[in-house]
Amino acid sequence: MNKKIIIFGGTGGLGSQLVSKLGAEGYTVKGLSSKDVDVTDYAQVEGVMQEHIPDIVINLAGANADSFLHKLSDTNNREAARKVMKVNTVGVVNVVAAALPHMRSNQYGRIILTSSVLTKKPVMGTGVYGSSKTFIKGLVMTCGLENASKNVTCNALQLGYFDGGLTHKIPDKVKTVIKDSIPAGRWGTIDELYNTVKFLIDTPYCNGTSIEVDGGIQ
């Protein structure tokens, strides 16, 4: 196989498990945390790309800070929201921009980003985070369009609530309400995340789209 993968956000609950499962498939996988590379700093991201020359880039890195929009008049809330937007938009653009040159040159590349179920079913207090994930849906459409002729695909995973990742930070009472709202009646699993990632790697005709992996939430 000999394909090299970089996973930004690859040391968290979901990321570390995805690193292990892809590694077991024969890929050479490097999982990076925010301490390893600041995705909002293009020079750092470009340095990682030049060092590893990945065939496949997966971005799980993200920031979240819930706040009602009317409370963004508070300086601290506004600063937290600014960080969310910077990591989830500028950071993602940096990852994509730094990955594309060598992928286009090699005539092979897979870029997989992460969006959110909040783009279709918003929750109060998540306006900034949800908006940042809506940005991802538009980005992959253009990226796929621009790079398909070079055998480079760009897609997004529009994720629901998984057993791991940000879900563990949700208060228990809220978790119960959320789980009851999921038609599947449960959290997503790492196997389901892995299977979707593997599908996107193996299916170049799937390009410029966001795949809903959310247990049927409408």
Give the role of each language-model region.
Residues 101, 145-146:
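Alpha-helical segment proximal to the catalytic Tyr-Lys
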